[in-house]
Design a protein with these regions (language model features):
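Mixed-charge, glycine-accented linear interaction segment located at domain edges/termini
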Residues: 152, 157-163, 214-290
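Short, structured patches in soluble enzyme cores that scaffold and shape functional sites
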Residues: 76-78, 200-202, 246
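Solvent-exposed edge beta-strands and adjacent loop segments
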Residues: 1-87, 140-148, 214-241
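Extracellular interaction modules
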Residues: 66-71, 159-168
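Extended beta-strand solenoid/passenger and fiber regions
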Residues: 81-148, 173-197, 202-212
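Low-complexity, intrinsically disordered segments exposed to solvent
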Residues: 59, 156, 179-180
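Short, hydrophobic/aromatic-enriched beta-strand segments in well-ordered soluble domains
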Residues: 76, 165-175
């Protein structure tokens, strides 16, 4: 069977052991996150070759190969708090879980409706400062920011505020556990990306035009913790790259005495069709080990 490859992978990372990711505990084999919005995915292998050289011209006589490395790189169009946690080893705080509240930063332009007071969209946090700056008719700052005093509910008191004046407000507010929900990602200096069991399903098309299920399995991959977040107002939207190094380990459902860096499974069942193959993960055909 010969085939061509022109399809992206859907990737799942599963817990290798009972482990915590982003503040949540996953048992061995439990899926941590599915990646279904990838733009590219690449498996790259490399080896180091050294040679015995000699004779006239010092030509190569014998070669030795070793230091085999395998890397799986995927580029995701979308990002989630959990994927950030996987990439960086960060902890997640969910305002809906437990009693811990998240303090959020907000800015708002407000026109004075009541003498000496401003009405905000959110209730200012009791322990946080509120700063206001008066704006002119063109929306420019007219002076330095001054501290306001918290009032009742969403109201703050601003000395000298006249009806019709406009202020720019910088303040903080808390999640309330009901309507206002938030997630917080904490990237710590001593936490890094972990090890996972990777399965990447895709389609290989044979010479008859039939798409056959194929799967890359890396039984032990370590997520590199390097990352770049690019923000721009023009051009293509940012993508997010995950690079994982493969380490030898046995397959979860295979010969436990044989360690591999990667296993590639290709289904060559002649009775399958395109629709069935696109959703199947059965591998009745050859398995290629690296």
């Amino acid at each position: 069977m010969r085939f061509g490859v022109r399809e992206i992978c859907n990737v799942v990372l599963k817990a290798k052991t009972s482990q915590r990711v982003g503040g949540f505990t996953f048992e061995e084999g439990q899926p941590v996150l599915w990646f279904t919005s990838l733009k590219t995915s690449t498996v790259e292998g490399s080896v180091e070759t050294v040679y015995a050289t000699g004779g006239r011209g010092n030509s190569r006589l014998i070669a030795w190969e070793g230091d085999r490395n395998l890397t799986f790189t995927m580029e995701d169009a979308l990002l989630s708090p959990m994927s950030i946690a996987i990439l960086t080893g960060a902890g997640l705080i969910d305002s809906d879980v437990g009693e811990e509240k998240i303090v959020l930063h907000g800015t708002q332009t407000v026109t004075v409706a009541t003498q000496g007071a401003l009405e905000l969209e959110q209730t200012p946090a009791a322990s946080a400062d509120v700063w206001v700056t008066k704006l002119d008719k063109l929306g420019n700052y007219t002076g330095k920011a001054v501290k306001a005093t918290a009032g009742e509910g969403k109201s703050i008191t601003v000395t000298g505020a006249v009806v019709g004046d406009t202020y720019f407000v910088d303040y903080y507010y808390e999640t309330d556990g009901t309507k206002l929900h938030a997630l917080q990602v904490d990237i710590a200096p001593d936490k890094f990306g972990g090890n996972y069991y990777l399965e990447a399903e895709t389609l290989f098309r044979d010479e008859n035009g039939i798409d056959r299920p194929a799967e890359f399995i890396i039984p032990n991959c370590k997520v590199q913790s390097n990352f770049t977040f690019s923000m721009a107002s023009s051009g293509d939207p940012s993508t997010f790259t995950f690079t994982m190094d493969a380490f030898p380990a046995p397959l979860r459902y295979g010969d436990k005495t044989k360690k591999v860096l990667c296993s590639i499974q290709i289904c060559d069942d002649e009775g399958t069709n395109n629709e069935a193959e696109s959703s199947s993960t059965t591998t009745d055909g050859p398995t290629i080990y690296v």
